[in-house]
């Protein structure tokens, strides 16, 4: 099934799962659904519970990796996920897996365009082991934006070429107004390799608005930055929404606004600009190298669970131990700005697991990402990279596109994903020519020389800090909390109270800071974003982990 954006893919899939179980006499143990993220697996489980109640608990909805770790008989995490899918496929093909563990009559694959060579090998092995098995693969080749990690929509195409296969296109868009859909169709024609051939059709009678605002790349050899005009757009939208709310007759539910960028750095700079104008905004970004289960708050909670169940032989975590672990963790980390991520994760785990199996908790924690638990519901604005906006929708979308001269299909698909997130209005601020030919859009030219914001924020990731520097300071670091201020000096971060250095930036980050300093910026503040567990991959197995600080550096002109 080639499901276009806004076609109700998730709803259709959930209803199909319910139909298989209730109307088509498929037993729950014969049904397997595979997804590419823990967040997707959780969403399907939640929606299925709303539809069929407790019966949803018995349906196997797994990520490719967790299913394969199950077959290999071990719990894994994202760091160890490397060859696990490939190994599982080989074991199935070699007859090394008990037939009853892989005996399925229906296999459902979500986001099938994201399959890699190993994922497709697993699907092929399951098909070979279950000759009568039905496979329902749903995806959109135009939304394959993970080529960098090996995914390729050609594997979805190969499924369409298998014997007795049927190819269905879901082309009705229930999300976006007409001009937005027409513009997205126009743009998609630039993508060279496509499976879908039928244009998407908007189910709305309203036109909507698409604006392409073109900016010069530079004026008098000085680069033009597009943050300020996006801020001005946001201010206008917020003013417009406020006046609508004041008029009770035309009042709508809170309308959502999102700013989509290509890079994390752009997203963080945009966020800082919004905050400097007292606009509430939340950031959803890719957090390279940061694993949810390595957060200090998560590790402490797991430690309390481990201590509590040591005496019990039950695979299920008793409610009193669960509640005690929560209370102790919430109390210890009450001032931590990272605590909401843990709170939200536990809330979701409680909703989707009737019995709290210890193995399920570990799998849930190991497979989750920090950004899975970012609550964007109470923000005026969501600032996000395009990658992290996939699967979401907003009333208004503003895109910041500094595009390359020769965009690849991968880049074009990324822009297509961003464009199709919006329901009502799309505004693209760009300094290139890629969007010039879009007929359904209003084209504007803004010749103003916008400068960089006076304040920027740099978020340090693992590669931006000297990881070994923090080893001797583990105890001191574990006493700190996310959100606490630090003092920056000579490429080091220290505790304001004692002056003790606890972190140092990497050589690469020193060079980056040097470039900002040459533009007139200097670090004026620093604060802890996350405290995380870390150990070198080359370290001996018995070596203890270090605690490292990932901080935000505020720079001003």
Residue ranges and their predicted role:
Residues 1-77:
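P-loop NTPase Walker
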Residues 1-5, 32, 60, 64-154, ...:
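Conserved helicase NTPase motor core
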Residues 1-5, 165-172, 193-260:
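Inter-lobe coupling/hinge region of RecA-like P-loop helicase motors
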Residues 26-30, 57, 131-133, 140-141, ...:
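Short glycine-/polar-rich loops that comprise or flank the Walker A/P-loop
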Residues 38, 178, 247, 258-414, ...:
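Core RecA-like ATPase module of SF1/SF2 helicases and allied nucleic-acid translocases
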Residues 86-92, 281-312, 519-557:
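Charge-dense polyanion-binding interfaces
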Residues 121-222:
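Conserved RecA-like helicase ATPase core segment
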Residues 436-557:
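Conserved active-site motif detector
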